[in-house]
Amino acid sequence: LLRLIVCLTTHKARVMKIDLSGKVALVTASTAGIGFAIAKGLAASGAEVVVNGRSERSVNEAIARLQNEVPGARPRAAVADLSGGEGVAQLLQAVNGVDILVNNAGIYGPLDFYDTDDAIWENYWQTNVMSGVRLSRALLPAMVQKGWGRVVFISSESARNIPADMIHYGVTKTAQLSL
């Protein structure tokens, strides 16, 4: 799906059109980077995209950019920090069900293994793994009941080839491959 969405947003001459009209897509951490590209591709395919980020400003800027780059896009805002259960609960209240869930939220950065304490490990685990687990657990039953839905976890090459200076990150990305 990610490869297809990137194609939708970068190769206008040979676009494969997927009609997602009437579908609601939540893309976590979608104010920039990969998340924004995914949101843009889904919006270009007709989905109503829920843009998520940690600050109202970044979400509003991403929505404005999305509306500018995808004529007819109808994005919605969902401001929430997904590094803990409270932020996930806040996001769930804002979305009221979706057809497509793209678990893109994640943090990364190089850290020395010996200096990475339990609190740092826990923060990476909660943000990179548990945010997606919590959202999937809450949103997937309605998809199953409707008979249609998609859940995607965005992982990384670091899941299979864990960098020595980002073991804490690589482990969380490996966990995502199992979900």
What do these predicted ranges mean?
Residues 9-26:
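Flexible N-terminal pre-Rossmann segment of NAD(P)-dependent oxidoreductases
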Residues 24, 31-32:
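Conserved glycine-rich cofactor-binding loop
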Residues 47-61:
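Conserved glycine-rich Rossmann-like NAD(P)H-binding loop of the short-chain dehydrogenase/reductase
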Residues 56-57, 78-90, 118:
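The beta1-alpha1 cofactor-binding region of Rossmann-like NAD(H)/NADP(H)-dependent oxidoreductases
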Residues 99, 107, 114-133, 148, ...:
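Catalytic Tyr-X3-Lys loop
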